[in-house]
Design a protein with these regions (language model features):
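Structural and coupling elements of P-loop NTPases
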Residues: 1-276
């Protein structure tokens, strides 16, 4: 059983977000695919950082990229990449701020230890030197240990990013599409999860995954565009018209215009993607 606590997104109710976060083990952070990172997004992310919650990023309203902004799948991929960079920049600022505070505390602590050691050395130096002994200076303070920041960032290949449309009831992760294409492409799911997002391309002839440096001048679509976004765009173009403004009304009855979008929902229901 999963208990969900819905908190208001308006900045005037940030205290309610703060209260709710203290009752939770994790947080589902929604970001509008069109509007991107706003002040309230930063506030919510900061609260999850302070409370040490495990955040899950949901890029919502993906349908608006198609129906309102009229983006192509390639343009949408570039837009989503920049949005993800903005969110991770916020997380990185939290990490850097905490690191600077930890570094300052460590330096203060080391300074206290050195001062205490110096006082002890001064009190015993005269007797040690009279006996002809040397002073041990090998006991130096340990160096500051850097914390690994790899786990604080959002990345689709880590399965902590969900793309979806709440109004149409669908959402998906890279892991789900990797499961769909595993048998068709003959590539292990664990490998597909790592290459479905980023600068990776599928060779249509050899069915091999290529990095950008092995393209050799060929203009291939990123795998996320080719295997994921192209399919979703095709569904919306067949029903709502997508970025063309015309749906395929000629061969789809009016009552079935949303049938394909329902099919996306059946494959990738929002609740399963978030909590499955």
């Amino acid at each position: 059983m999963i208990n969900l606590i819905d908190s208001p997104g308006h900045i005037d109710f940030s205290y309610e977000v703060s209260t709710a976060s203290r009752l939770c083990d994790g947080a589902v952070v929604l970001v509008d695919a069109v509007e991107g990172v706003c002040s309230q997004t930063v506030t919510v992310l900061r609260q999850t950082w302070i409370e040490k919650l495990k955040p899950l990023l949901v890029i919502n309203k993906m349908d608006r990229l198609i129906t309102e902004l009229k983006m192509s799948p390639g343009e949408a991929y570039t837009h989503l990449s920049k949005l993800l960079e903005q969110v991770n920049a916020v997380m990185g600022s939290f990490y850097q701020g905490e690191r600077m505070e930890d570094d300052l505390r460590w330096r203060e602590k080391m300074e206290e230890r050195l001062n205490a050691a110096a006082e002890k050395t001064d009190s015993r130096s005269s007797s040690i030197l009279e006996n002809g002994d040397s002073i041990d200076t090998t006991n130096t303070p340990a160096e500051y240990e850097e914390k690994d920041d790899e786990d604080i960032y959002f990345a689709p290949e880590k399965n902590n990013v969900i793309f979806g449309s709440a109004i149409d009831g669908w959402a998906f992760t890279v892991r789900q599409f990797a499961g769909l294409y595993e048998k068709k492409l003959g590539i292990k799911r664990s490998i597909l999860e790592k290459v479905l997002w980023g600068d990776f391309y599928l060779d249509p002839k050899t069915k091999r995954v290529l990095s950008s440096k092995h393209l050799k001048g060929r203009h291939l679509k990123p795998m996320f565009v080719q295997l994921v976004l192209d399919n979703i765009w095709a569904v919306y173009e067949a029903t709502t018209g997508g970025n063309n403004g015309k749906g395929c009304v000629d061969f789809l009855p009016l009552r079935d215009l949303s049938a394909c979008i329902i099919a996306i929902y059946l494959y990738f229901p929002l609740q399963r993607s978030c909590f499955g």
